[in-house]
């Protein structure tokens, strides 16, 4: 029995040191340090663990402050390479200490830095902390203020998370992103203050996620120029947001909890996507680009909850005769949004002379079962051009006579 008991107690000590270090790397540093009392072998083993995780709430001591505990841990560390450093501050901590710890971690060839600061606290993340040759992952969360007045260098950074942080200005965002030459993954979750235009121009970026669900009143614009992007997920954009996207290699795109403005620069990027999912209630789409109606079919198929559809032609007097190269083909199946959700349909500067636009308008009126109001406006015609006025009247009468799927639909024609 004694031998059996001894075997059980000594089982952990018989494990390879590399395996023990791997097990310890998944624990908070406080627990890792506590293992030093298990045996003589473990007394110094924790010092080789290449991961440090500190939370100010977990360190309450009558003898040492949180800062002193963290400093002692860094001084005791013997791991030649620090794989990760997670710092969480829910109480006031001297910013100088934070900068010192991060600097020490960079000197230990840090690979991943996660920095969480409680909303009531503020830590300015300066440009001096954005010079690291080994950092591959950087996550900044909540009470962090990004102030980067000039480009820096994070030449190994591949993943960047900006979670509800604030920025000194728009230039700080541009300088941060331009300092990451091989960045592949970017997550932007909300952002605060001093920024109207959020510019994302990262040639190497492959995956982008944006979440902005607070629906603040001020206007915001995301300008995204990402030629290598494969995956895009956007959540929460509302009518006060504008999105300009250049992503010719896009494969997957997901839009949820908001409305979407499809501008000319946006059309080609979405058209290239092989998988498109739109959990949106309102869609505003420009009708200038070549074959825009084929993309409209994709958008309707991908937006089962769509309630408001607005088509806008900004070209006014510019002829579109040379723009179109393909005819419009009706969907094989009526999109779900037309069968069960679409209530409002607006078409600004409807080109009554184009057969394709007539076909699109007719299809929507014939299939939108819950449509309550349709508003169609056309470009102005000079009163002296009687022949053209008569042609327009006939074409609009034809559209007005279309048998509508919704008996309660009120169709209104407006002339600019």
UniProtKB/Swiss-Prot annotation:
Record-annotated F-box domain positions: 9-62
Top-rank taxon: Eukaryota
InterPro entries recorded: F-box-like_dom_sf (IPR036047), F-box_AtFBL13-like (IPR053781), F-box_dom (IPR001810), FBD (IPR006566), FBL13/AtMIF1-like (IPR050232), LRR_dom_sf (IPR032675), LRR_FXL15/At3g58940/PEG3-like (IPR055411)
Protein name (database record): FBD-associated F-box protein At3g52670
Gene3D superfamilies recorded: 1.20.1280.50, Ribonuclease Inhibitor
PROSITE patterns hit by this protein: FBOX
A Pfam family this chain is assigned to: LRR_At5g56370
Span of domain FBD: 327-378
